[in-house]
């Protein structure tokens, strides 16, 4: 056991003495030491229940003959950080989480670890630590929140964000907005649609790093507690088998995950997190792989924000495994998972308990919702290194569009203008200097896109940014434009009124300005300098472009 280095032999008497100070007995010294890495806190709805899941995990570890030791990581709520400087700290927190897990696990020589994250950057941070450390590990994602129910329809956090835009446009009363505010977020769990947190939970299961059914089992469901307990039991077996993440996750595993991503219409943030995760596993995952697999993998289930169904419906219809079942002819079924079985072997044991709902909301390869997957990668004179759009959530009328640019150098300026009614049908809103370095921190533009949506403009207005979007964003919203403005990317050269061409079927994003004019602008271009201090200053110096996953040196 790895932990032998801190607990065996006369020379380790002092180490054992410290362990005994925590209550460890001599008999426990002979058992595997398991880290329970918990991102519980009291301000993030997706994390307020993780203390209970950690207790279940620890019970499972003890049942199987291990000794659990719990420690905590940070966790940022993107919803609470949205629309102000706090969002600059969200993406950077991913690497902080990964680094702190490495520090704790390496310093204390744990034999294995159970990782308990829920929300947007916390799940990838935990996964990246699993790839970097490569000790036996299993992930228990915290599970979705139940949807709200207002005015005889299901609602979620995005309903509230869009309600703000509707209120500003005079389409919603203050009392109606208050009702949405009070009733749309029903309690513990990640926001109730196929937004970033739930997309990453699905990616975790598709990669084989969590037990079957974990991704969609809801935060308040007893099934989640049982999965947590079973995960605690399983980690002890993983230690004995020396089955580590790099023996489970391969290039083919990432291809499987991307195909599932395309089928469920997942968040564009996967194009940041999966390449960064692959990097920690010693693999490469370029943007072109996403687009190649999108062209051959159909979109099979219409989930919020691009459709009517919530994670609750998806879970009842069979969850990730039900989609894997539909995609079986395309997937690498020989890939291993943390339960020791291959994806194909897990499928053999799959029971669909609600066959009617399964058939109603998860379509087939022969009759999909869309022939292509949920995400498209666009390139052109405005994005030479690429950009991404959730094409599954774009109105057909806006899949091909050319319009005049309305340019803003930060999200706050754009929001004021949108809410003031300055943005008109046909316009293309450009928000720049919001990339990984330029922000710094690559903020999400959900407040802006939700305001546009709430004002009824998503069928006529597009938004382009070198920042990124929430998984809750819908409409013709193109993000991760690379190179970013602060690095001299063409998005920094756009002026008000310039025509921009968007062609999603052809994967084109062009600035309709002559080469001669662009060269003139480039010669005079000086990106604004932002004074940043503390962690953001270190992050700005070391972060890489969005098209490579925004990894940090």
From Swiss-Prot:
PROSITE patterns: ILVD_EDD_1 (PS00886), ILVD_EDD_2 (PS00887). Its cofactor is [2Fe-2S] cluster; Mg(2+). Its EC number is 4.2.1.9. [2Fe-2S] cluster binds at residues 119, 191. GO terms for biological process: isoleucine biosynthetic process; L-valine biosynthetic process. Mg(2+) binds at residues 78, 120-121, 444. Binds 1 [2Fe-2S] cluster per subunit. This cluster acts as a Lewis acid cofactor. Pfam families: ILV_EDD_C, ILVD_EDD_N. InterPro entries: Dihydro-acid_dehy_C (IPR042096), DihydroxyA_deHydtase (IPR004404), DiOHA_6PGluconate_deHydtase_CS (IPR020558), ILV_EDD_C (IPR056740), ILV_EDD_N (IPR000581), IlvD/EDD_N (IPR037237). GO terms for molecular function: 2 iron, 2 sulfur cluster binding; dihydroxy-acid dehydratase activity; hydro-lyase activity; magnesium ion binding. Keywords: 2Fe-2S, Amino-acid biosynthesis, Branched-chain amino acid biosynthesis, Iron, Iron-sulfur, Lyase, Magnesium, Metal-binding. Pathway: Amino-acid biosynthesis; L-isoleucine biosynthesis; L-isoleucine from 2-oxobutanoate: step 3/4; Amino-acid biosynthesis; L-valine biosynthesis; L-valine from pyruvate: step 3/4. It catalyses: (2R)-2,3-dihydroxy-3-methylbutanoate = 3-methyl-2-oxobutanoate + H2O; (2R,3R)-2,3-dihydroxy-3-methylpentanoate = (S)-3-methyl-2-oxopentanoate + H2O. One of its GO terms (cellular component) is cytosol. It is an enzyme of class 4 (lyase). The modification N6-carboxylysine is found at residue 121. The active site is at residue 470. SUPFAM superfamilies: IlvD/EDD N-terminal domain-like, LeuD/IlvD-like. PANTHER family: D-XYLONATE DEHYDRATASE (PTHR43661), D-XYLONATE DEHYDRATASE YAGF-RELATED (PTHR43661:SF3). Functions in the biosynthesis of branched-chain amino acids. Catalyzes the dehydration of (2R,3R)-2,3-dihydroxy-3-methylpentanoate (2,3-dihydroxy-3-methylvalerate) into 2-oxo-3-methylpentanoate (2-oxo-3-methylvalerate) and of (2R)-2,3-dihydroxy-3-methylbutanoate (2,3-dihydroxyisovalerate) into 2-oxo-3-methylbutanoate (2-oxoisovalerate), the penultimate precursor to L-isoleucine and L-valine, respectively. Belongs to the IlvD/Edd family. Homodimer. This is Dihydroxy-acid dehydratase 1. It comes from Methanosarcina acetivorans (strain ATCC 35395 / DSM 2834 / JCM 12185 / C2A).
């Amino acid at each position: 056991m790895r932990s032998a280095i801190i607990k065996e032999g006369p020379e380790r008497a002092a180490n054992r003495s410290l362990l005994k100070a925590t209550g460890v007995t001599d008999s426990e010294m002979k058992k595997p030491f398991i880290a329970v890495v918990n991102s519980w806190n009291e301000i993030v709805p997706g994390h307020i229940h993780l203390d209970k899941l950690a207790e279940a995990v620890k019970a499972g570890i003890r049942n199987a003959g291990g000794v659990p030791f719990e420690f905590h990581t940070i966790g940022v709520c993107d919803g609470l950080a949205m629309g102000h400087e706090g969002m600059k700290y969200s993406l950077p927190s991913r690497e902080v989480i990964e680094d702190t897990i490495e520090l704790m696990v390496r310093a204390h020589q744990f034999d294995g670890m159970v990782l308990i994250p829920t929300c947007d950057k916390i799940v990838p941070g935990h996964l990246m630590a699993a790839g970097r450390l490569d000790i036996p590990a299993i992930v228990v994602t915290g599970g979705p929140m139940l949807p709200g129910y207002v005015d005889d329809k299901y609602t979620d956090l995005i309903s509230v964000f869009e309600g703000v835009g509707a209120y500003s446009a005079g389409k919603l009363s203050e009392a109606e907005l208050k009702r949405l505010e009070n009733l749309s977020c029903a309690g513990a769990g990640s926001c109730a649609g196929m937004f970033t947190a739930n997309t990453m939970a699905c990616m975790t299961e598709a990669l084989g790093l969590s037990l079957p059914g974990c991704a969609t089992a809801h935060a308040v469901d007893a099934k989640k507690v049982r999965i947590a307990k079973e995960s605690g039991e399983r980690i002890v077996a993983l230690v004995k088998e020396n089955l580590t993440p790099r023996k489970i996750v391969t290039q083919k595993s990432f291809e499987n995950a991307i195909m599932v991503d395309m089928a469920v219409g997942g968040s564009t943030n996967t194009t940041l997190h999966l390449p960064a995760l692959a990097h920690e596993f010693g693999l490469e995952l370029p943007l072109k792989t996403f687009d190649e697999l999108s062209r051959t993998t159909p979109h099979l289930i219409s989930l919020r924000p691009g459709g009517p169904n919530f994670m609750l419906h998806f879970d009842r219809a069979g969850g990730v495994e039900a989609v894997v079942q539909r995609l079986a002819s395309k997937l690498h079924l020989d890939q291993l998972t943390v339960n020791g079985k291959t994806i194909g072997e897990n499928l053999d044991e799959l029971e669909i308990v609600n066959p009617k709902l399964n058939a109603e909301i998860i379509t087939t390869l022969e009759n999909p919702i869309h022939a292509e997957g949920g995400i498209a990668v666009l390139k052109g004179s405005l994005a030479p290194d690429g950009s991404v759009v959730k094409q599954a959530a774009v109105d057909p009328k806006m899949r091909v569009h050319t319009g005049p640019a309305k340019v803003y150098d930060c999200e706050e300026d754009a929001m004021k203008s949108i809410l003031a009614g300055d943005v008109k049908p046909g316009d293309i809103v450009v928000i720049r200097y919001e990339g990984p370095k330029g922000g710094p921190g690559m903020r999400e533009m959900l407040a802006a896109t939700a305001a546009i949506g709430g004002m009824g403009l998503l069928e006529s207005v597009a938004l382009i940014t070198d920042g990124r979007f929430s998984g809750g964003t819908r409409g013709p919203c193109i993000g991760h434009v690379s190179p970013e403005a602060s690095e001299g990317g063409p998005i920094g050269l756009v002026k008000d009124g310039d025509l921009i061409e968007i062609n999603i079927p052809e994967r084109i994003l062009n600035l309709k300005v002559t080469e001669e004019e662009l060269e003139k602008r480039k010669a005079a271009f000086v990106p604004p300098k932002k004074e940043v201090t503390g962690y953001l200053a270190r992050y700005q110096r070391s972060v890489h472009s969005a098209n490579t996953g925004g990894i940090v040196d």
